[in-house]
Amino acid sequence: MPKIISKRKFNILRKTKEEIFSQIVYTKKRNGLHKAAKEYYFKDKDFTIIEDQQDRPDKPEELDTPDIPKPPKPPKGPDQPEEPGQPGGPDDPNSGNKKMPKPDEFVTHRQLQEFKKDLLVELHEIFPTKPELKRVEEKVDVLFELQKAQGEQIRIQGEQIKELKVEQKAQGETLQLILQTLQKMNDRLDKIEGKMDKMESRMDKMETRLDKLESK
């Protein structure tokens, strides 16, 4: 007989196991209506699973514990009033009404333990644990320190670039002064060369006059 599980467990199983195939196997009658059920086969599973529309079975599973007879309750007399919160007690809202509502569904201890395990698995998948949060915080701290160091390095590089710009500006001004000085020296040399040319022409004239005087 295939095992019938709840939708929640079925969804968890579909996420964790590989589904091979599925088929409609039978119809079940509920409230006078026939409804199709679906049988699923999963990998690494030695049983099949039928998708059920109810989250809990109609009947509780039988426990393996032996039946322990309960001691009979003593009759409640006027000297022994009912306990608060119990049927017939002072805090009972249904006091005076002997008919108590019965629950529609029952859950065994085994089903409750399975529900707790499945809930822990879901919470572990959704929410991180304390060690994982600690590792994330450590990574964030490392990234923060790295960003801080990079910011300091960028600030130092910016100051160095600013100093280099100031130095380049000073070097440019010095080079401009040197070029101006060289230009002035070239102008002076040109003037001196012009004066020397004039002196040479005068000396040439004086030599020609001396030659004429000597020839006479």
UniProtKB/Swiss-Prot annotation:
Record's compositionally biased regions (Low complexity): 83-93
InterPro entries: DUF16
Basic and acidic residues composition-biased segments: 47-62
Region annotation Disordered: where it falls in the sequence: 47-104, 194-216
Comp. bias (Pro residues): 68-78
Record-stated family: Belongs to the UPF0134 family.
Name used for this protein in its record: UPF0134 protein MPN_344
Source organism per UniProt: Mycoplasma pneumoniae (strain ATCC 29342 / M129 / Subtype 1)
Higher taxonomy: Bacteria, Bacillati, Mycoplasmatota, Mycoplasmoidales, Mycoplasmoidaceae
